Amino acid sequence: MHAVVVNVEIDDPDAARKGLEDLVPTIEQAPGFVAGYWIRLDDRHGISVVIFEAEDQARAGAPPADGTAPGVKMTGVAVGEVLASA
């Protein structure tokens, strides 16, 4: 399994929440999707971790590193191998 980890700065919390309502069903339909978690760290920062079955699927599902989404600015995007889960 491979994970897509995205760090964001939250500019508009209401728009960000609405954007997630639209985004999550789309991500769930992506090839190889296993699980996804969107986490608010504080009022201005968040992180998401989306797990895919294979590296190529994770890379295909990763947003551009300099991308934006409603209410957020992406500050980092990485794809890595999942070494363990519980």
Q: Model-predicted segments: where are they?
A:
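Short S/T/G/P-rich N-terminal loop/turn motif that feeds into the first structured element of a domain
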Residues: M1-I47, E53-A86
